[in-house]
Amino acid sequence: MSDYKIWVDADACPNPIKEILFRAAERKALPLVLVANQMIRVPPSPYISQVRVGVGFDVADQYIVDHVEPTHLVITADIPLAALIIEKGALALNPRGELYTVDNIKQKLTMRDFMEDLRGSGVHTGGPDSFSQADKQAFANSLDKWLVRV
């Protein structure tokens, strides 16, 4: 099991997702690393750690990319980061339980870029729906599917 690890792009990760991850790390004795540019509260555990990176654009993302390995799972809502993780052969899961894959990442990037272009031209596109109990459950289910394999 020592080859497996979970990385968290922690600055924007919802607290309920972190709690699920903390419990999973303890239950499976699995390394969990939260990467952020601010201090993140983590429970005392030999399996849970945090890395505080400097402030700057995509500094936490780059740290994760530099350290991820193919047997790792990365939790992120950042689609460009997910694309880089997939390129390195690892898995990326968003906090709403959606697994980013080789098959869907290009479409996700295209849609993200399109929405960014719309916002840049002054069109109000709205944001994602509020994080819900259904999202939390979908994440827990997806994480459990990965944990069964480790």
Curated annotation (Swiss-Prot):
Record-linked Pfam families: DUF188 (PF02639)
InterPro entries: UPF0178
NCBIfam families on file: PRK00124.1
Similarity-based family: Belongs to the UPF0178 family.
Name by which UniProt lists this protein: UPF0178 protein Shew185_1764
